[in-house]
Amino acid sequence: MPARCVAAHCGNTTKSGKSLFRFPKDRAVRLLWDRFVRGCRADWYGGNDRSVICSDHFAPACFDVSSVIQKNLRFSQRLRLVAGAVPTLHRVPAPAPKRGEEGDQAGRLDTRGELQAARHSEAAPGPVSCTRPRAGKQAAASQITCENELVQTQPHADNPSNTVTSVPTHCEEGPVHKSTQISLKRPRHRSVGIQAKVKAFGKRLCNATTQTEELWSRTSSLFDIYSSDSETDTDWDIKSEQSDLSYMAVQVKEETC
């Protein structure tokens, strides 16, 4: 059987995660512990070597600092008391509810249930009633839809026959939704034609054949003049002139092309 705290209104064990301390061997300190327990327990006559008190009844100054640090760091699960530590903290019992208070609580619960039922009934949708448009909106067209609904109830175990009940006709009146139509036709248009005049720029061509013929006629005349003479220095001059004329003819052809 695990050891339990002997203090009044307490019963912590090591399974509760509390540190348990046995009564000290010092007689003077043990008397102080007995006085503490007897303060809330009239049937307490004195503790023995197996009597324990849990750590909930000691002030923080009664614990060794190193043991507190070790427990916070989870190195150890048990606290240690300093020499001469005496329990001073009593656990206050939870007050038991009185009979009058029990009746008041039951009445409060009933009133809360009634209020919730009333809220649900208010939130439930009721039959839609006919609403008339305002004076300012009487000119607008209104749409009235009246529907007759028949509700058929399912047969119960006691009454196998099907019962059909008619629901009174309800009218719904509301403003007509107006729609706007926009014409997206393409407007008339006129196309204007533009005519551009293009001038043809040609090249002036020269007749190269006539020029070459004139050059060859000049060379032939020179050959006729000097044909009777022997080949002298003048012959070399004529040949050079012929080469110059042929070169000029080639240049004329290149310019015309």
Curated annotation (Swiss-Prot):
Q: Where is this region: Disordered?
A: 154-178
Question: SMART domains attached here?
Answer: DM3 (SM00692), THAP (SM00980)
Q: Which organism is it from?
A: Homo sapiens (Human)
The protein's name is THAP domain-containing protein 10
Q: Pfam families from the xrefs? A: THAP (PF05485)
SUPFAM superfamilies in UniProt: Glucocorticoid receptor-like (DNA-binding domain)
Compositional bias (Polar residues): 154-168
Q: Where are the zinc fingers (THAP-type)?
A: 1-90
Q: Name the source's superkingdom.
A: Eukaryota
Q: Which UniProt keywords apply?
A: DNA-binding, Metal-binding, Zinc, Zinc-finger
Molecular-function GO term, any one: sequence-specific DNA binding
Q: Tell me the gene name.
A: THAP10
